[in-house]
Amino acid sequence: MKILVAVKRVVDYAVKVRVRPDRTGVETASVKMSMNPFCEIAVEEALRLREAGAATEVVAATVGPSQSADTLRTALAMGADRAVHVLHDPDPSRPLLPLAVAKILRALALQENPGLVILGKQAIDDDCNQTGQMLAGLLNWPQGTFASKVILNKEKATVEREVDGGIETISLDLPAVITTDLRLNQPRYATLPNIMKAKSKVIKKVTPEDLDVDIRSDMEVVEVTEPPKRKAGVILSSVDELIDRLKNEARVL
């Protein structure tokens, strides 16, 4: 069985995000980029399923500019067998919406015919948490979201997911779509030999037009601003002063 894993290039989680001077989006020039942490977990889970004998091939895919190839090479260095790059140069004012990404992944899934599609439950840049669900809807496949445990056999996937007050266990007929939670696994580090091998591997390149997918966006970003700075705290001299401020200023008493 083949597993298709979707990955995304984002600003590294350790970088302090800054807004562009023209307020059209987030500054990405000369900023460290990396694979979305939830996507790393998706790749790791696909590799573990292959190593357990539940899958025979792991194919990584991404949508983005030429620089996104670095993210695919990270997936290859981790152990993915092949990679597909859907080339798309982003327009800050017309972002690539989750529905457009889901349409592209649907087209790739129809080409690759995987038994399972795994992707992170969300990306840390936009936090949309929509692509996996939309992909399952477009493919008319069952879905298991926020997976914290995955067990795979030839015909079914068993997914454990954390819900309010406990753990929910669901059974999915394959093919299916699964989105990963942070608790699912701990991604491995790519070894230096595998990193070097990944640099020489050929990445298949296609465009949305090649896949016959319309990715035009109906949404326009009007303005992006940084959150307001938090006001400095005030040291109070007594409990009486605290109570007075809670009553007369905050009006919570």
From Swiss-Prot:
Q: What is the lineage of its organism?
A: Eukaryota, Viridiplantae, Streptophyta, Embryophyta, Tracheophyta
Tree of life domain: Eukaryota
Carries keyword ATP-binding?
no
GO terms for MF: electron transfer activity
Q: Name one GO cellular component term.
A: mitochondrial matrix
Database matches in Gene3D superfamilies: HUPs
Q: Which GO terms describe its biological process?
A: amino acid catabolic process; fatty acid beta-oxidation using acyl-CoA dehydrogenase
Q: What is this protein called?
A: Electron transfer flavoprotein subunit beta, mitochondrial
Cofactor (UniProt): FAD; AMP
Tell me how this protein assembles: Heterodimer of an alpha and a beta subunit.
Q: PANTHER family recorded for this chain? A: ELECTRON TRANSFER FLAVOPROTEIN BETA-SUBUNIT, ELECTRON TRANSFER FLAVOPROTEIN SUBUNIT BETA
| UniProt key word RNA-binding | no
List UniProt keywords, sorted A-Z: Electron transport, FAD, Flavoprotein, Mitochondrion, Transit peptide, Transport
- Cite the cofactor comment: Binds 1 FAD per dimer. Binds 1 AMP per subunit.
Organism (species): Oryza sativa subsp. indica
Q: Where does this one sit in the cell?
A: Mitochondrion matrix
